[in-house]
């Protein structure tokens, strides 16, 4: 930025010096000239000048046109006769001589080949044709290429076809149409071998390019049918219909052979019939989708069965482990099963609680034993006594037992708060089960206390002492 600012300052100073006005006034003499002529004369002078300027422009193109005409007249007689006279006769003579020599050699070779191939041909006719070929080369080419071949083909079709139909058996006559209708490559090879024995028939019934494409399409179709994908395609292209087609073709071939030796009709290749291809593709896609859905459903069913088996096995292992733990540890008469099953066992007429405990341990919940052990149940070595005299000392319980009441605390010392909590939980479970308030069982697990007894309400006649 600094050098730019310096350059700008320098330029401003230099321009200021140039524009400095002189201190003294400068007197410049000025002469005023007055035109006495009217201003209209100026316009006339300008128009005359324009007219003079236009005149030489009109003269110039005339001179150019004259020069162009002179040049054309000079160029035309010199160039045209040289081009027309010199090259034409030389080129025509040379081309004619070369063409005649080539045509004569080609015709001689063709005539010799025809003589070798057709020994029955007449030599006089060939000589006449050779003389005509020398005179008219172009016409003879067309006659050699088109009419002779057609005549030979018609003779071959008429003479040997009748002999073959009479001499050969009925199976060999069906060979030619079987090439196009049978998709099997083995039959195609057999038909080709049979045609090799009779080259004349092969020339008369040579397959066209469209028929070759049909054989290729049939071969590809056979490969697809032999592949695993063909199982899907065979559902939409039944085999009985395909087997019936050759039989009908044989009948038609027999009729045609009896009437006249007609060439078989070309079959439509697969790629020229798009509707059938589209329908078969759609059906194949639908079959593939259905098979995929079936496979996925089977896989999901297998996964579900496997998961259920794992769950059952895991539950069985847990039940076996918890069952061993209950047999070794839990000796309390409290059953590990559900509460409703316990109530049914207690009030169903079973007077012995220990007898009702083992079937309750085999309940559907395998973790009930661990929950009961952690809930406050402890091993009890001393047997529980249930005197009837102590039951009368307890006041009657009118309502539900709350955890804050002191009725349970009278029989349980303060040091056994955990046991008291377990008893309260048992009472809560009875409340949830819908047991009447007159049939409540209070369990005290401390065997050292004198008041260690299960106190039942006198109204509950079927209560079991623990």
UniProtKB/Swiss-Prot annotation:
Biased composition (Basic and acidic residues): 124-160
Residue stretches of biased makeup (Low complexity): 170-180, 203-216, 379-394
Subcellular location(s) of the protein: Secreted
Cellular component, GO, one term: extrinsic component of membrane
Domain of life: Eukaryota
BP-aspect Gene Ontology terms: imaginal disc eversion
Biased segments, Acidic residues type: 404-416
Signal peptide residue numbers: 1-16
Compositional bias annotation for Polar residues: 185-194
Keyword match Secreted: yes
Keyword Zinc: no
Sequence repeat feature ranges: 48-50, 53-55, 58-60, 70-72, 74-76, 78-80, 82-84, 90-92, 94-96, 98-100, 102-104, 106-108, 125-127, 139-141, 148-150, 155-157
Region feature (Disordered): 55-94, 119-220, 378-435
Carbohydrate-modified residues: 294, 352
Region (16 X repeats): 48-157
UniProt keyword list: Glycoprotein, Repeat, Secreted, Signal
Task performed by this protein: Probably has an essential role in embryogenesis, induces morphogenesis of imaginal disks, and may participate in multimolecular aggregates.
Entry's free-text remark on domains: The regions 203-253, 256-333 and 335-377 are thought to contain either alpha helical or beta pleated sheet motifs.
Protein name: 20-hydroxyecdysone protein
Organism encoding this protein: Drosophila melanogaster
Lineage: Eukaryota, Metazoa, Ecdysozoa, Arthropoda, Hexapoda
Gene name per UniProt: ImpE2
């Amino acid at each position: 930025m600094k050098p730019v600012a310096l350059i700008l300052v320098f330029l401003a100073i230099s321009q200021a010096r140039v524009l400095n006005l002189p201190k003294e006034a400068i007197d410049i003499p000025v002469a005023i000239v007055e035109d006495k002529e009217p201003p209209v004369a100026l316009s006339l002078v300008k128009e005359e000048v324009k007219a003079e300027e236009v005149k030489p422009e009109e003269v110039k193109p005339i001179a150019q046109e004259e020069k162009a005409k002179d040049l054309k007249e000079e160029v035309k007689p010199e160039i045209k006769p040289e081009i027309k006279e010199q090259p034409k006769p030389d080129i025509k003579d040379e081309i004619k001589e070369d063409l005649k020599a080539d045509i004569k050699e080609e015709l001689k070779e063709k005539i010799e080949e025809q003589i070798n191939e057709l020994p029955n041909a007449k030599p006089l006719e060939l000589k006449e044709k050779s003389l005509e070929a020398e005179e008219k080369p172009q016409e003879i080419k067309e006659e050699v290429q088109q009419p002779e071949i057609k005549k030979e083909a018609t003779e071959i079709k008429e003479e040997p076809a009748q002999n073959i139909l009479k001499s050969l058996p009925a199976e060999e006559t069906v060979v030619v149409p079987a090439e196009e209708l049978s998709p099997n490559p083995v039959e195609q090879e057999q038909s080709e071998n049979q045609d090799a024995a009779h080259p004349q028939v092969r020339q008369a019934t040579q397959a066209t390019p469209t028929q070759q494409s049909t054989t290729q399409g049939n071969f590809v179709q056979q490969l697809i049918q032999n592949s695993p994908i063909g199982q899907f395609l065979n559902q939409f292209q039944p085999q009985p219909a395909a087997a019936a087609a050759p039989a009908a073709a044989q009948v038609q071939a027999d009729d045609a052979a009896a009437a006249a030796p007609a060439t078989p009709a070309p079959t439509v290749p697969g790629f020229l019939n798009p509707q059938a291809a589209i329908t078969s593709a759609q059906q194949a896609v639908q079959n593939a989708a259905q098979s995929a859905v079936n496979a996925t459903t089977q896989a999901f069913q297998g996964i579900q069965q496997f998961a259920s088996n794992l769950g059952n096995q895991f539950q069985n292992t847990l039940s076996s482990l918890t069952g061993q733990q209950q047999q070794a540890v839990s000796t309390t008469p409290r059953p590990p099963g559900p509460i409703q099953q316990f109530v049914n066992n207690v009030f169903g007429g079973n007077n012995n609680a220990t007898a009702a405990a083992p079937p309750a341990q085999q309940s559907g919940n395998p973790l009930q034993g661990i929950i009961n052990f952690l809930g406050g149940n402890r091993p009890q070595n001393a047997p529980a006594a249930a005197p009837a005299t102590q039951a009368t000392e307890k006041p009657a319980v009118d309502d539900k037992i709350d955890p804050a009441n002191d009725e349970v605390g009278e029989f349980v010392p303060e040091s056994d708060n955990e046991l008291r909590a377990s008893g309260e939980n048992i009472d809560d479970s009875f409340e949830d089960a819908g047991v009447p308030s007159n049939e409540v069982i209070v369990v005290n697990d401390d065997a050292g206390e004198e008041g260690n007894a299960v106190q039942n309400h006198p109204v509950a006649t079927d209560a079991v002492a623990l």
